[in-house]
């Protein structure tokens, strides 16, 4: 099993992430941001990752640091669990619909961090959650997992549906990219021989 645990402590947040890439979708989430927990649950269930995240942040100010630092720490944990990337599929993609909403996520474990985020949210907030924080979450993940990530909401009227399809598609694309390919066992998935 490919497991990792990462702890990140700053003056703004204290975060612990534990992940099993070869899990069954079990999760234990306590970030202090209920909507973030709901989205992290989508990643775990649709990625079939066993995921534990505990976060304590400066929520008396706002959710920004907690959401961003959770993305950072999750990215670090995924990178640690994958290790040298031998045998992984490297690329992953998924389309996910939810009623009127449809999102596409494509990921490459290239070692080159890059985020293309194109989600025209129809509202600025989902309950109390600022939708802009989703960009900060994924930017933190990308920079610390070392991936190229393209996120596109192709259509949607309900902001909750837009957000949920993004996180579900991300979980499924991440699962595909991190899966071990039996035909490429022990090989780095690159013509360069390294990622």
Curated annotation (Swiss-Prot):
Domain of life of the organism encoding this protein: Bacteria
Protein name per its UniProtKB record: Imidazoleglycerol-phosphate dehydratase
Enzyme Commission (EC) number: 4.2.1.19
Catalytic activity: D-erythro-1-(imidazol-4-yl)glycerol 3-phosphate = 3-(imidazol-4-yl)-2-oxopropyl phosphate + H2O
Main localisation: cytoplasm
Compartmental location: Cytoplasm
Designated gene of the protein: hisB
GO MF annotation, one: imidazoleglycerol-phosphate dehydratase activity
């Amino acid at each position: 099993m490919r497991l990792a645990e990462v702890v990140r402590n700053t003056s703004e947040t204290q975060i612990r992430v534990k992940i099993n890439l070869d899990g069954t979708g079990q999760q234990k989430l306590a970030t202090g941001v209920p909507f973030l927990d709901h989205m992290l649950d989508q990643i775990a269930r649709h990625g079939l990752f066993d995921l534990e995240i505990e976060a304590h942040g400066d929520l008396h100010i706002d959710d920004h640091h907690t959401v961003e630092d959770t993305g950072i720490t999750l990215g670090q944990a995924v990178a640690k669990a994958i290790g040298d990337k031998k045998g992984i599929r490297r690329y992953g993609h998924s389309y996910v619909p939810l009623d009127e909403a449809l999102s596409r996520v494509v990921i490459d474990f290239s070692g080159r961090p890059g985020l293309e985020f194109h989600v025209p949210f129809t509202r600025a907030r989902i309950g109390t959650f600022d939708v802009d924080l989703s960009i900060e979450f994924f930017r933190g993940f990308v920079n610390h997992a070392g991936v190229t990530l393209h996120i596109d909401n192709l259509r949607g009227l309900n902001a909750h549906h837009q957000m949920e399809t993004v996180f579900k598609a991300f979980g499924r694309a991440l699962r595909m990219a991190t899966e071990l390919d039996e035909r490429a066992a022990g090989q780095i998935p690159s013509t360069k021989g390294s990622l």
